[in-house]
Amino acid sequence: MGVAALISWFVTAFVGLYLVAVWLIENDVTHRGAAASRLPAPVILGHVLLALSGLAVWVIHLLSHSSMLGWSALGMLVAIGALGLTMFTRWIPVHIAYVAAESGKHGRRVADYDFPAERAFPLPVVVGHGLLASTTVTLVVLAMIGVGGG
């Protein structure tokens, strides 16, 4: 179960890094001509750094069989999830508004620069990242309580 959690964590991290890349490419740090991001940089940075640090702790746990490190990795996942849910709830209104503007329901199409960088996040990627993260947490919990032989 521990190795399955590791694989799930790696895949989740790669999908998350794709989202960070999209955000960095689309983000106008000068705030000239584009709406400011609704995702605070410290929250994004904290989420990414905690996720990568937690992944490292989980790898060390698997190699050393240290229960303390396993539970620490799970605690880190809780913090990672809290930051992820914070970003998700701040992204939803941007996505809804951008989809409505793209459809032209209000008689005119709104330019991309009227929306923050996270408008470019593909919905399937965001949903997939969240589902993978939930799977990772579940697998880590199962591994830590001894289901699946380690």
List each model region and its residues.
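Membrane-embedded alpha-helical bundles that constitute the cytochrome b-like, heme-associated redox core
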Residues: M1-G150
